[in-house]
């Protein structure tokens, strides 16, 4: 599949979707995107910058949600114009989709909304590539129905994203088999390495996270075989205004990407035996 001027899939190099969880300021966005662009260019990794102008799914009403659509889209537009990188943001049921699609290159649908048929189809109708996050409650094989809803309105540029599955209260686990299962949708599969270590509501009024496991899960996912990796990153995660506990430090990103790129090249050169031996 072509995405933002480059090809993605199991026959192509790993691509990266990365940035802070939420847009905090123009300067932070430009600085973070600039550093990510530099490191991905050095490593030959196609890169899409991500950040949210509104985080509707927050644990508590007083949690920081973002700068709002007008200011947020203006900052994303500045990132595109200044750095020449494609941008992604997530949308919600009450988002003016046409206004967002006029600015960003990729639309993302939140995991909790993956079963909302009207929403998925309305997003797909905007004519932009869509990254559909699998719900924490959903079996990987059920994503084929979600994809069919999006394709039914004429959008063939669909990606599916694994971000962990609920495992009791306040914790998620990642089943690497789901990455192979979701290939059956015919879509590029993306692994969200940072939300997969989130502890939803785990700190009472906000979510916790175990960022030390980000590289473990990222390595495992790339070894399993994915088109791309999604990672939220921040120059100072302890001071991030949203999802800091599971954000990967920007200063440690390049070393992790080097490792992931090496693994990706190895597994994609050798092929995927499970495609031959899986029983349908």
Curated annotation (Swiss-Prot):
GO cellular component: cytoplasm
Subcellular location: Cytoplasm
GO biological-process terms attached to the record: keto-3-deoxy-D-manno-octulosonic acid biosynthetic process
Regions crossing the membrane: none
Catalytic reactions on record: D-arabinose 5-phosphate + phosphoenolpyruvate + H2O = 3-deoxy-alpha-D-manno-2-octulosonate-8-phosphate + phosphate
MF GO annotations: 3-deoxy-8-phosphooctulonate synthase activity
NCBIfam families per UniProt: KDO8P_synth, PRK05198.1
Cross-referenced HAMAP family: KDO8P_synth (MF_00056)
Family: Belongs to the KdsA family.
Protein known as: 2-dehydro-3-deoxyphosphooctonate aldolase
Organism: Nitrosococcus oceani (strain ATCC 19707 / BCRC 17464 / JCM 30415 / NCIMB 11848 / C-107)
